[in-house]
């Protein structure tokens, strides 16, 4: 069948409700919000970065939306830690799911340690001999890791050895230590003051995990009772917290385990409803899917990894609302995350708005603790 265009039937774009693009006019740009708002009316990656501000602003403005921030990649030695602090302090994030390494390097900085620029003239063998651990073009001192091991063991000394712990309990305790001993800012310190839980699903895959393991082994060698550690307590706590929400959103920095662990909550709640014995499944559990998502990660979808898969793939798993609002920025987070977040902050300020939510996180956490006492995982 031959297809021909009829010039008499050409559309104008406007009659199909297409949005006109606009030239980027630097003479009209006064701040980050102006720049990214203008970029949202351009094309390609620039447009996506601009649209990311729209999505972040919308999820933060939605009074019923609980936001989960997931973190992977070396964001803290890359000096992005204060962005996380601000997202917690300003109410953009109500729960954090992170790699253990990211929390480890952040704790180094929070407790007074310093990261350095890597000198490419130094070989990796030379770095090893001098106690310089390389993370791409950043140096983490082995001495700094030794220093935080002492702090972690000091904190663990205060744990009730008859109780069962988890990563959330440990990160809260470390946040309290920072609050009691360090004047500066820190991710775990902000989380402690704002009652934001911090989960580390792959907690053994990090320096903090190794420190906890060494503490437990040393306890056994010294004839002391090691405390119990159950990662399923984190999953249960997170499930009960998310289950209380009307709507949920996810901000994905990178991908990996934190992203999947956070997203799988939707099918988990569905499985609890459908697969536990009838009459014995928790009656208060309800289904929920993510209504908003903002992902900043350069990984391509064709590699097949979770870090690169689009949110739309999550619809097939029952994780994402097919009618939700999602933006994915395929860029290095250290480049665009500060722009996106600063532009969103400015947009709130310019409109005379603050983040207001219809829930009190502290009250919800109290309810979670009450519900968890009904189970025997601990």
Residue ranges and their predicted role:
Residues 1-54, 59-60:
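N-terminal glycine-rich anion-binding loop in soluble enzyme alpha/beta folds
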Residues 66-74, 97-98, 250-251, 294:
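Short glycine-rich or small-residue beta-strand-to-loop segments that form or flank ligand, phosphate
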Residues 126-208:
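Ligand-binding beta-strand-loop-alpha-helix segment within the catalytic cores
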Residues 84-149:
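A generic, well-ordered mixed alpha/beta core segment in the N-terminal half of proteins
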Residues 201-248, 258:
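Active-site rim loops that border cofactor/substrate pockets in soluble metabolic enzymes
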Residues 52-66, 190-192, 239-247:
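Glycine-rich phosphate/diphosphate-binding loops that line cofactor/substrate pockets in enzymes
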Residues 2-16, 47, 240, 247, ...:
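C-terminal functional extensions of proteins
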Residues 79-82, 107-113, 210-214, 262-265, ...:
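Short acidic, glycine/serine/threonine-rich loops at helix termini
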């Amino acid at each position: 069948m031959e297809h021909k265009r009829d010039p008499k039937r050409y559309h104008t774009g406007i009659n199909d409700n297409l949005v006109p693009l606009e030239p980027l006019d630097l003479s009209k740009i006064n701040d980050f919000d102006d720049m990214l708002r203008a970029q949202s009316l351009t094309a390609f990656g620039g447009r996506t970065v601009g649209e990311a501000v729209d999505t972040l602003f919308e999820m933060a403005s939605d009074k019923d939306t609980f936001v989960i921030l997931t973190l992977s990649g070396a964001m803290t030695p890359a000096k992005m830690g204060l962005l996380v602090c601000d997202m917690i302090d300003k109410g953009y994030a109500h729960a954090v799911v992170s790699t253990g390494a990211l929390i480890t390097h952040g704790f180094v900085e929070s407790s007074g340690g310093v990261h350095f620029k890597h000198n490419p003239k130094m070989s990796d063998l030379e770095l090893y001999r001098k106690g310089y651990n390389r993370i791409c073009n950043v140096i983490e001192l082995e001495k700094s890791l030794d220093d935080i091991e002492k702090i972690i063991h000091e904190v663990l000394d205060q744990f009730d050895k008859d109780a069962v712990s988890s990563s959330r309990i440990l990160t809260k305790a470390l946040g309290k230590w920072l609050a009691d001993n360090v004047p500066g800012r820190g991710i775990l310190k902000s989380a402690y003051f704002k009652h934001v839980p911090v989960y580390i699903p792959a907690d053994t895959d990090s320096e903090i995990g190794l420190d906890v393991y060494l503490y437990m082994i040393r306890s056994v060698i010294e004839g002391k009772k090691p405390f119990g550690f159950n990662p399923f307590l984190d999953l249960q706590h997170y499930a009960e917290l998310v289950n209380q929400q009307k709507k949920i959103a996810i901000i994905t920095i990178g991908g990996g385990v934190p992203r999947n662990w956070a997203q799988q909550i939707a099918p988990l709640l569905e499985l609890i409803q459908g697969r536990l014995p009838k009459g014995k499944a928790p009656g208060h559990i309800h289904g929920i899917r993510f209504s908003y998502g903002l992902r900043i990660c350069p990984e391509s979808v064709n590699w097949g990894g979770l870090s690169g898969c689009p949110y739309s793939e999550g619809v097939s798993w029952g994780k994402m609302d097919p009618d939700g609002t999602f933006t994915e920025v395929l860029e290095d987070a250290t480049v665009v995350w500060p722009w996106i977040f600063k532009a969103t902050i400015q947009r709130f300020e310019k409109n005379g708005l603050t983040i207001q939510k219809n829930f009190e996180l502290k009250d919800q956490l109290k309810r979670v603790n009450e519900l968890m006492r009904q189970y025997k995982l601990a």
